[in-house]
Amino acid sequence: MPRVKRGVTARARHKKVLDQAKGYRGRRKNVYRIAKQAVMKAGQYAYRDRRQRKRQFRALWIARINAAARELGLTYSTFMNGLKKAAVEVDRKVLADLAVFDKPAFAALAEQARAKLAA
């Protein structure tokens, strides 16, 4: 069986990791052993934060809807309950957008919710 020299594959592997570590500070960008750990940790953070981003946006939307609803004399929970009773199927992302950029439309939805809560 012939001898296998793995210099080419090792260089390619090192280059790949060091390219991924471009922009890091200190030895994390140019020392393979340290860069490899930094790239692995970055991947873990990226994986975790792709999931956290969804939670954080939902929390932001809820905070915006709550603030706008309170300006109109409703709490978030009563506002959402009223919308559900009024059969208004608008998601939180759109509601938050309306609360920030189209206050009259949000106020109209709040009135619909208030009417269904009173009935």
Swiss-Prot record:
The gene is rplT. It comes from the Bacteria. It holds the Pfam family Ribosomal_L20. The keyword Glycoprotein does not apply. Binds directly to 23S ribosomal RNA and is necessary for the in vitro assembly process of the 50S ribosomal subunit. It is not involved in the protein synthesizing functions of that subunit. GO terms for biological process: ribosomal large subunit assembly; translation. Belongs to the bacterial ribosomal protein bL20 family. This is Large ribosomal subunit protein bL20. One of its GO terms (cellular component) is ribosome. InterPro entries: Ribosomal_bL20, RIBOSOMAL_L20_CS, Ribosomal_protein_bL20_C. Keywords: Ribonucleoprotein, Ribosomal protein, RNA-binding, rRNA-binding. One of its GO terms (molecular function) is rRNA binding.
